[in-house]
A protein has these predicted regions:
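Start-transfer (signal-anchor) and selected internal transmembrane alpha helices
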Residues: 1-22
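Extracytoplasmic catalytic/substrate-binding loops of multi-pass membrane glycan-assembly enzymes
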Residues: 25-40, 47-63
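Loop-to-helix entry region of an early transmembrane alpha helix in multi-pass inner-membrane enzymes
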Residues: 54, 69-91, 123
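Membrane-helix interface segments
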Residues: 74, 102-108, 150-157
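Transmembrane-helix motifs of polytopic, lipid-linked glycan transferases
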Residues: 80-101, 139, 143
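Specific aromatic-rich, kink-prone transmembrane helix
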Residues: 92, 116, 120, 132-150, ...
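Transmembrane-helix signature of polytopic, membrane-embedded enzymes
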Residues: 93-116
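Short acidic/glycine- and proline-prone juxtamembrane loop motifs at membrane-interface regions
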Residues: 122-130
Length: 158
């Protein structure tokens, strides 16, 4: 009974969990050329710091070294990592929106709207490099928001 009450109070977390599971179950079946290039660079260790997708091959190489023992192809493993990072993006979006509006139905609808958009789902389910920088961008905005809420910025005006 208490679990159902907590789930009702925090429906947006359930939406985030369901979307993350959906991303992980519905990985892209026809990846683009960049996805193959990223997987090859991550697996081989060559061209790790390509200016085209700076640091993504390095990130992929770390993922493959940490979870390479799992019975997945490198492309699938990197797609799963992107799905998990996409779930992290949705958590950050929820945290930022909660400061603006506390109503759970608003949070639930907003997270669903962001998480179910085509662009977000495409990069969450494919081996593309855009979801990881989005996560770090949202993380930096979240911490900027925390700073601005806790500290007064009046000293900037002097």
């Amino acid at each position: 009974m208490k679990l159902l009450t907590n789930l009702k109070k925090n429906r947006s977390y359930v939406v985030i969990l369901l979307l993350t599971v959906l991303y992980a179950l519905l990985l892209s079946a026809n990846p683009v050329g960049d996805a193959y290039s990223n997987a090859f660079a991550s697996q081989s260790g060559e061209d790790m710091f390509s200016p085209h997708h700076l640091l993504y091959a390095f990130y992929g190489n770390i993922i493959l070294k940490l979870f390479g023992f799992l019975p997945f192809e490198p492309m699938t493993l990197l797609q799963l990592a992107n799905a998990v990072v996409a779930g992290g993006c949705l958590l950050l979006i929820r945290r930022m929106l909660k400061r603006i509006h506390h109503e759970e139905s608003f949070l639930c609808a907003s997270v669903l709207f962001c998480g179910a958009s085509f662009g977000f789902m495409r990069f969450a389910t494919d081996n593309e490099c855009y979801i990881v920088p989005l996560f770090f961008c949202l993380l930096s905005i979240y911490y900027l928001q925390v700073f601005l809420v806790r500290n007064s910025m009046s000293w900037l005006l002097k």
